[in-house]
Amino acid sequence: QEDTKYADRNATKNGAKVGGELSDFERIHFNAVKAIKHFDLPEEEQMFFQAEVLVKNFIPLEYITNIANFGIPIPSQPKQLQIKTPYTAQITRNTPTAFIFLVDHSASMQNETTLLGEKMTMAEAAARIVNLQINELVLRCIKSNEVRHYYDIAVIGYDEEAYSDWKGELEGRDFVSPEELRDSPYKKIVTREEKRTRKGVVVKEVEKVQWIEANCDGSWTHVHKAFDRAKRLLTEWMEKHHEKDCYPPTIINITDGWFNGASNDYVLQQANELKSMFTNDGNVILFNIHFTNEDTVESIACPIMKEELNNDEYAEMLFDMSSLLPERYNADISRCLNDNRDGRHRAMGVNADATTLIKLMDIGTPTNISQNQ
């Protein structure tokens, strides 16, 4: 029967109608499909929600194999039976990954904090920590005096607008390669760094490379514009790498407070759309880190349950916006945060001081680089 090629009323309790025309297919609002509900479900149930969405929107079965899966990794050779664990792809020159750092440049970032015993503005601390992490990423790419292209890295600053945050020769660029970063430093500064010695941990002055600069001139915190820019960059990156088994890109958003200029629902929808983007190895990971100068406020990092947030409205908003981390991250969370609990953690931090921010950045930058490729 011709009708058996399509979803019928028996396929779902909601009573989908027969509909195999292109007009039926065009009725689907895919942004609505990427609803909060999908990400709130346990991982083992997400595929059933996906199937119900496809069926009740009258999609002809012949089209289903060509539709994005809203969260389930698609194998690079779909006609072959494969068993694949997400977030296990090796990072190589042929299968790179990407990092996007989003940095709040609003005026409140001029408040003071302490980084390794040195007083400075939160903007300066955030810039130093991001520069430190970028430098670490570049160092991971150096093999036998060769800088290998394992990563594409972008930094987006935001206040009233969102823009490329690179300085110097890279100014105005979006994604740049590790080799370009090594060859185009903006400037070098002397900072303090903890060093382990036989006498214990000591703080020494060391020279550090900078690619971005502290900025707290903005009046607003328009994170929705930063998310829009990040989505555009990732869309282009995904199109370039869609046939490869690439480790999913990571977005790390650092802010000191509430965003403004857009509703909570709108920003949450943007976050869900970013999290719904995927490679053949899994979905994009979105970290949201609330950076503070208050040592007296309890810091919350990578919680498992909302109950840990003490009914903090802002923390609960970040919880909903942030990715549910794969269990492979648990070892890093245990190492950095001394949190040995089983379960899936959220990629978030609230009231994070400079030390906690460093730890969260370390968790957010995976190290599964191939040693030979």
Regions found by a protein language model. Name each.
Residues 178-246, 285-297:
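Von Willebrand factor
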Residues 80-96, 144-148, 241-249, 258-373:
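P/S/T/G-enriched low-complexity
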Residues 2-78:
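Active-site-proximal loop/hinge segments that shape catalytic or ion-binding/gating pockets
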Residues 78-122, 235-244:
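Acidic, polar low-complexity linker/tail segments
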Residues 95, 119-130, 215-230, 263, ...:
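Phosphate/oxyanion-binding active-site loops and adjacent basic polyanion-contact surfaces
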Residues 109-150:
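…and closely analogous acidic/polar surface helices at protein-protein or active-site interfaces
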Residues 101-106, 126, 230-231, 247-264:
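DG-centered beta-turn motif at the end of beta-strands
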Residues 146-209, 297-308:
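Short beta-strand-loop
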